[in-house]
């Protein structure tokens, strides 16, 4: 039976480098591919080596005392849960286990009162040390994945050389089999396409047209998703004509304006709008009530959680006092204790090393004791007096009371209400048009005064809008109203009596509109707006007369001539006649009038105009030049005169000085 070789063992430096290169190429998921490059290691061992040692995120620095203390406290809280402890400390689980074992072994050598080995934990970390525990010859190397790599030998084995060469060849090949096959297929398709194009070009040169499409009819009818766009809607070419839409919109607007002008806005729309507003107000009110209810429930939950936290609080356990009254010397004696000495002693008394030693001893003591399940006589458990937890009904009543007290305190802060009740009575004008309320308003006595007034205000606004629609069309369309004095007087002798009446009525209406909307100071007789009944009667009479009138029907004329040979011959003969007439008229004009004389006079006039333009241009240039020279001369004259004035002033000053000197000399 051949020997079975088990993969594993110490990791060498060559294997580590191969593993790093393989991870950089294959990633952190294809461990079977990575392990295929390593002859003596499996996929699980390769993954463990990367996660335990080669990962650059691993902290391999020396353990600090704070980390040791944290490790011991976590080992006490989470026994044997090293996978959970490792991410909290920031190291691997294996390193945590080894450090924990090292700390337990170090406590065997340290006495309870001895201080000679206090600094034993300051040496190198577990990473640079051999396996923990007492190692003997022949012992197994546990967790080789978390140990440093074995250095390479100068003369490597043939097996290692073969593994290194194979890994180098495979890792250098960045293009796999699939990529090579795809590239080869693309090259074949390109060569086929080029050969087909060459064949088609040769056949076309020979006079034979061959299509590149498939010859299969079924295949040819399928949709080509590479060539075409599915569900494509092509827009119309050029500018889109929207004249029809604009005309339809205009007609619809005119129809609506006519309907409103004749019938007015129906009250049903106003009622629906008012009903919609009431529904929205009710909905907002309900939402506000729901929100307040939710806030109350949230406040109740907060109170409940707070009470639960208070119930869960445990009794505060303080450490035993270090100094008692018996050991403390009396005040004022020579052996009294200084306060500063006590504070420094208390602060340095329990250092980090002492805490680490205490924690390790306690852990070892717990490991030494047998389980309570295996012991014959179980130790008596001290009875602790615990406060009974209140029932759910009591808790519910308690937080309800707290919420009610909170609400009462908030309501108590509100200001006192002002009960000033007043009734606003509507004032009615006797000349005003009577407004009929709806049946709902008249019959329902439960509607309050504010709602009734609001309905009356809506009806009043509706009447105002109807009154605006009964004005003249010029005012409704906001057209400019001309001044009455700018109107032209018509000739009464040439117009009929009906036209004269229409003109007078139009003038009176124009004066009234001008005084109402343009110039209130303009004095004229104002015309009151028609009431709704008169307006309806007038519109009915106009529509009745329009219905009785016969509308003139215009026959549509075609702008195209019939396309026949007879019509074409008539058009050609007509064109010949027009051509002969135009030539005869041209000959008669040329015979009676000397055209050359007109051309000569035209040329002379153009020449004179050109000469005058040139002279005008030169005169303009000279004028600009002389103007510029004048400006420069004025500036220079001003500067020269200023300079000469300064010289004269200097001469006068010098003359005065000389005269003073002469006077002084004469006096001396």
From Swiss-Prot:
Please give the GO cellular component terms listed in this UniProt entry.
cytoplasm; Prp19 complex; spliceosomal complex
> Looking at the UniProt feature table, which residue ranges are given for the DNA-binding region?
31-54, 82-104
PROSITE patterns tied to this protein: HTH_MYB
Q: CDD domains under this entry?
A: SANT, SANT_CDC5_II
Q: So which domain of life are we looking at?
A: Eukaryota
InterPro entries, alphabetized: CDC5L/Cef1, Cdc5p/Cef1_C, Homeodomain-like_sf, Myb_dom, SANT/Myb, SANT_CDC5L_II
Residue ranges annotated as compositionally biased, kind Acidic residues, are 152-161
Q: Which Pfam families match?
A: Myb_Cef, Myb_DNA-bind_6
- Biased composition annotated in UniProt, kind: Basic and acidic residues: 270-289
Residues in domain HTH myb-type? 1-58, 60-108
Q: Where does the record place it?
A: Cytoplasm; Nucleus
Q: Where is this region: Disordered?
A: 111-190, 262-293, 322-346
Protein name, entry field: Pre-mRNA-splicing factor CEF1
Source species of the chain: Debaryomyces hansenii (strain ATCC 36239 / CBS 767 / BCRC 21394 / JCM 1990 / NBRC 0083 / IGC 2968) (Yeast)
Q: Its encoding gene is what?
A: CEF1
């Amino acid at each position: 039976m051949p020997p079975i070789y088990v993969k594993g063992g110490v990791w060498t430096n060559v294997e580590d480098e191969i593993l790093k290169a393989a991870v950089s190429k294959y990633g952190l998921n294809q461990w079977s591919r990575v392990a295929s490059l390593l002859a003596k290691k499996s996929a699980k061992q390769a993954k463990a080596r990367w996660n335990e040692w080669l990962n650059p995120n691993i902290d391999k620095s020396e353990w600090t005392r704070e980390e040791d203390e944290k490790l011991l406290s976590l080992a006490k809280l989470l026994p044997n849960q090293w996978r959970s402890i490792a991410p909290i400390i920031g190291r691997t689980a294996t390193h945590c286990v080894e450090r924990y074992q090292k700390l337990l072994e170090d406590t065997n050598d340290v006495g309870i009162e001895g201080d000679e080995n206090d600094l034993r934990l300051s040496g190198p970390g577990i990473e640079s040390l051999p396996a923990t525990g007492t190692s003997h010859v022949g012992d197994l190397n546990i967790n080789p994945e978390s140990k440093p790599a074995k250095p390479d030998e100068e003369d490597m084995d043939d097996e290692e050389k073969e593994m290194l060469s194979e890994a180098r060849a495979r890792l250098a090949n960045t293009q796999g089999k699939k990529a090579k096959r795809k590239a080869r297929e693309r090259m074949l398709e390109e060569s086929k396409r080029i050969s087909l194009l060459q064949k088609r070009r040769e056949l076309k040169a020979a006079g034979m047209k061959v299509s590149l499409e498939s010859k299969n009819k079924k295949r040819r009818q399928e949709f080509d998703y590479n060539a075409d766009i599915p569900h494509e809607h092509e827009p119309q070419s050029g500018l889109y004509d929207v004249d029809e839409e604009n005309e339809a919109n205009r007609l619809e607007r005119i129809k609506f304006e006519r309907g409103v002008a004749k019938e007015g806005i129906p009250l049903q729309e106003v009622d629906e709008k008012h009903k919609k507003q009431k529904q929205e107000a009710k909905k907002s009110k309900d939402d506000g009530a729901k929100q307040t209810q939710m806030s109350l429930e949230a406040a109740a939950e907060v109170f409940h959680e707070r009470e639960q936290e208070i119930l869960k609080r445990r009794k505060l356990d303080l450490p035993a006092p270090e100094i008692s009254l018996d050991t403390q010397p009396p005040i004022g004696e020579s052996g009294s204790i200084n306060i500063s000495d006590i504070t420094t002693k208390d602060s340095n008394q329990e250092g980090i090393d002492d805490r680490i030693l205490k924690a390790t001893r306690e852990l070892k003591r717990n490991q030494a004791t047998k389980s309570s399940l295996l012991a014959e006589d179980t130790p008596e458990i001290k009875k602790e007096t615990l406060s009974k937890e209140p029932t759910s009904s009591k808790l519910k009543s308690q937080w309800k009371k707290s919420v009610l007290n909170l609400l009462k305190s908030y309501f108590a802060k509100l200001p006192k209400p002002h009960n000033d009740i007043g009734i606003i009575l509507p004032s009615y004008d006797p000349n005003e048009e009577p407004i009929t309320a709806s049946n709902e308003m008249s019959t329902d006595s439960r509607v309050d005064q504010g709602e009734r007034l609001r309905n009356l205000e809506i009806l009043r606004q509706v009447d105002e809008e109807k009154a605006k629609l009964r004005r003249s069309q010029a005012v409704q369309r906001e057209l400019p109203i001309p001044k009455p004095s700018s109107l032209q007087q018509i000739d009464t002798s040439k117009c009929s009596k009906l036209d004269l009446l229409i003109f007078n009525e139009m003038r009176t209406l124009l004066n009234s509109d001008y005084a109402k909307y343009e110039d209130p100071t303009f004095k004229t007789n104002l015309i009151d707006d028609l009431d709704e009944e008169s307006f309806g009667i007038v519109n009915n009479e106009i529509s009745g007369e329009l219905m009785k009138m016969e509308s003139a029907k215009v026959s549509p004329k075609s702008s195209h001539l019939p396309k026949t040979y007879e019509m074409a011959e008539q058009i050609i003969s007509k064109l010949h006649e027009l051509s002969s007439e135009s030539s005869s008229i041209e000959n008669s004009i040329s015979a009676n009038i000397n055209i050359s004389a007109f051309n000569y006079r035209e040329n002379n006039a153009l020449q004179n105009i050109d000469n005058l333009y040139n002279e005008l241009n030169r005169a303009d240039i000279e004028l600009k030049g002389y103007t510029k020279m004048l400006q420069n001369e004025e500036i220079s004259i001003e500067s020269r005169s200023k300079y000469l004035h300064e010289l004269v002033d200097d001469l006068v000053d010098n003359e005065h000085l000389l005269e003073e000197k002469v006077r002084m000399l004469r006096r001396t």
